[in-house]
Swiss-Prot record:
GO MF, one example: DNA-binding transcription factor activity
Alphabetical UniProt keywords: Carbohydrate metabolism, DNA-binding, Repressor, Transcription, Transcription regulation
Pathway the protein acts in: Amino-sugar metabolism; N-acetylmuramate degradation [regulation]
CDD domains recorded: SIS_RpiR
Species this chain originates from: Shigella flexneri serotype 5b (strain 8401)
Organism ancestry: Bacteria, Pseudomonadati, Pseudomonadota, Gammaproteobacteria, Enterobacterales
Residue ranges annotated for the SIS domain, each copy included: 128-266
Protein name: HTH-type transcriptional regulator MurR
Disulphides: none
């Protein structure tokens, strides 16, 4: 489980004290071997229980487990950095050659895949596969790059016999959402989870009794709160928005895994 990634992606939902803890852990990750929760609490002016609760919020049993995991992640990250001439999160610049751009893009996509797979809840995926396999009708929603991912998934699902709608027009998406029934499934794809059109479709689907499955980031969002199930994706941020490309890579890895799981389930 990549806790540094979870911290970065969950920042939008942190309280003031939680943000202090997150900032400390990221800034001092190389020094955590010699830091106790008591020392950390004193330095930040917060209670030890706040630190323990923060660790548990991220999925650790307590601060000790979180601290050891972060130390391990830091060591692994250093080894990877030393093994390549490119920094993991280096941005593409106007001076880069095509070869350097290709290497940076490939590394960004590799990182998105590694982090998405590391954070994946496979038990939840199995449950989602069971729900989709019983659905009389499936709607897939998304905008921009997410819509392309959705269209690809819709073609795959139709090939194996599912009734699927994946419309590019947002008005048509809304209309289809309002016609869903109990037992139907809506798969909403949005990395931010805050696109108004996608959120409105999810609200309509829930109102109709359909099951909403969101393929989205770890950050708290309206779509995440509406969904019955979530499939988490992770993508870095860079200056030239290779993030949108790595986001699509992460989303495609999730939808491909979902598709193969459904094929096996048949």
């Amino acid at each position: 489980m990549l806790y540094l990634t979870k911290i970065r992606n969950a920042e939008s939902e942190f309280t003031g004290n939680e943000q202090k803890i997150a900032d400390f852990l990221r800034a001092r990750v190389s020094e955590l071997k010699s830091v106790s929760s008591r020392q950390m609490a004193k330095q930040l002016g917060i209670s030890q229980s706040s630190i323990v609760k923060f660790a548990q919020k991220l999925g650790a049993q307590g601060f000790t487990e979180l601290r050891m995991a972060l130390i391990g992640e830091y060591s692994a990250s250093r080894e990877k950095t030393n093994a390549t001439a490119l920094h993991l999160h280096s941005s593409i610049t106007s001076d880069d050659s095509l070869e350097v751009i290709a290497r940076k893009l490939n590394r960004e996509k590799e990182l998105a895949l590694e982090q998405t797979c590391a954070l994946f809840d496979y038990a939840r995926l199995q449950k989602i596969i069971e729900v989709i396999s019983k659905a009389p009708f499936i709607q897939i929603t998304g905008l921009g790059g997410s819509a392309l991912v959705g269209r690809d998934l819709s073609f795959k699902l139709m090939k194996i016999g599912y009734r699927v709608a994946c419309e590019a027009d947002t008005h048509v998406q809304a209309t289809v959402s309002q016609a869903l029934k109990k037992g139907d499934v809506q798969i909403a794809i949005s990395y931010s989870g805050s696109k108004k059109e996608i959120v409105l479709c999810a609200e309509a689907a829930r109102k109709q009794g359909a099951t909403v499955i969101a393929i989205t980031s770890l950050a708290d969002s309206p779509l995440r709160r509406l969904a019955h199930f979530t499939l988490d994706t992770v993508s870095g941020e860079t200056e030239w928005r290779s993030s949108s490309m790595s986001t699509r890579t992460a989303q495609n890895s999730v939808t491909d895994l979902l598709f193969v799981g459904l094929v096996q389930h048949q």
